[in-house]
Amino acid sequence: MGLTKKKVLVGMSGGVDSSVAAYLLKEQGYEVIGATMQIWQEDKEVEEREGGCCSLSAVEDARRVCDKLDIPFYVLNFRDSFKKKVIEPFIQEYIDGRTPNPCIECNKHLKFDELLRKAQGIGVDYIATGHYAKIDKKDDRYMLIRSDDDRKDQTYALYNFTQDQLAHTLMPCGEYTKDRIREIAKEIGLAVHNKKDSEEICFISDNDHGKYILNAKPGAVKSGNFVDKSGNILGKHKGIVYYTIGQRKGLGLSVGRPVFVTDINPKTNEVVIGAEEDIFKTELIAGDLNFITFDKLEKEIEVEAKIRYSARPGKATIVPLKDGRVKVVFNEKQRAITKGQSVVFYNGNIVIGGGVIEAII
């Protein structure tokens, strides 16, 4: 009597990474099931023009891949959860003068929480995705580790993993470079082998988040003043949701020198403008923390910290505060630390944890 194969549900976006992840896991001997999370419904005209990563065309791409791999495929309805846990907080964060990262919230609440629970509810052992990251076990603790392809590493968006979630998650693409993943897809005859990577926010097909928020909550977007750090009025802005810390383009100001957004004040509806040197800071406060390598930060430790997806990690010290948050002190000034973005802590290639930036000091 043979051993029963372990079952894995692969979250499939219709892209090359999750498609090859499904193939690799089947080759490794798992019983693979493909599933696409239906999270947003574009109107037909936009759908046909844009074809984003959660669109109907993406669902069809995923279905065709599963047919090719001879594995079952399902579409799971996550629309209500996505709206409540990703879209509505995304809109509110911008209205509150912060710059959110919806991918992190989607990973935290949907992919590695609700999807995992749904999978376990039907007797599936693991979930898997096409993320570029690795999971390993050291002693009695699961670790999240940077991908072998440094350019494509996605651990910044994955720091909210719990130990139980890591124990039931597989990420086979983390062992490969992106180029090799595309080669594998071509070798096995997948039509998505040359499909371009999705770079926009998946539920905003034209990548214009300001217009999206204006349409969703028109009364919440109001014109206000651009001011300098002394409070002098420099001009009019079209609504704080259109701006982020460090922004230079699209301000519509003519003051005779390059100027940048240095702060956003939702209480006064003002956007503060200054010189580039004003957006370089060394300290921040972060909350909504999650740690992977240990349960709780008991004392200050030295780390490498990353303040946005595209940033290089900088050496820093994280200090626990009495209110449960942490202070992060960088050795060198960081450009455009932004409230609402996450700060993620590393020890070499190992993800220590992270949190959401709440204040810049």
Curated annotation (Swiss-Prot):
Question: Which Gene Ontology cellular component annotation is one that this UniProt entry carries?
Answer: cytoplasm
Keyword Transferase listed? The answer is yes
Reaction equations catalysed: S-sulfanyl-L-cysteinyl-[protein] + uridine(34) in tRNA + AH2 + ATP = 2-thiouridine(34) in tRNA + L-cysteinyl-[protein] + A + AMP + diphosphate + H(+)
Q: Which InterPro entries match?
A: MnmA-like, MnmA-like_C, MnmA-like_central, MnmA-like_central_sf, Rossmann-like_a/b/a_fold
The entry's family comment says: Belongs to the MnmA/TRMU family.
Function text: Catalyzes the 2-thiolation of uridine at the wobble position (U34) of tRNA, leading to the formation of s(2)U34.
Q: What is the designated name of this protein?
A: tRNA-specific 2-thiouridylase MnmA
Organism lineage reads as: Bacteria, Bacillati, Bacillota, Clostridia, Eubacteriales
